[in-house]
Amino acid sequence: MTERTGYRATTKFLIASPTKVRPVANVVKNKPYPEAMAILENMPQKGAVLISQTMKSAASNALYKNKQLDEDMLFVKEIMIDEGPRLKRIWCRGKGRADILLKRMCHITVVVDERAGE
């Protein structure tokens, strides 16, 4: 009695701050796949490009596993933006001091599924 969880794609170790990518993900959550892709293409943020690549992969996985599906039948069921490791870099400051600059990474997981009404 396991419930089908949809078709998943994950992209890991992307150099983008999770706090900057999450607002982009919240815009397209629970939207039909074609509408979500159209929204992401018109957004100026770097996170929109990263999410759209992962979403294309999830849709491709869905179409490969279920030949009867069409892209118009899919919707974005779930998007998770998780925090990854941080790259530590040195930022030289005045008077011989240095600060640590953290380059944050994120993991993007997109789950698409077939709409229940069809």
Swiss-Prot record:
Name the UniProt key words of this record, in alphabetical order.
Ribonucleoprotein, Ribosomal protein, RNA-binding, rRNA-binding
Q: Does the keyword Heme apply?
A: no
Q: Does the keyword Lipid metabolism belong to this entry? A: no
In its UniProt record, which GO terms are filed under biological process?
A: translation
One Pfam short name: Ribosomal_L22
GO CC term, one of those recorded = cytosolic large ribosomal subunit
A GO molecular function annotation here is: structural constituent of ribosome
**Protein family per UniProt:** Belongs to the universal ribosomal protein uL22 family.
Q: How does it assemble?
A: Part of the 50S ribosomal subunit.
Role: This protein binds specifically to 23S rRNA; its binding is stimulated by other ribosomal proteins, e.g. L4, L17, and L20. It is important during the early stages of 50S assembly. It makes multiple contacts with different domains of the 23S rRNA in the assembled 50S subunit and ribosome. The globular domain of the protein is located near the polypeptide exit tunnel on the outside of the subunit, while an extended beta-hairpin is found that lines the wall of the exit tunnel in the center of the 70S ribosome.
Q: What is this protein called?
A: Large ribosomal subunit protein uL22
Organism of provenance: Treponema denticola (strain ATCC 35405 / DSM 14222 / CIP 103919 / JCM 8153 / KCTC 15104)
Q: Which gene encodes it?
A: rplV
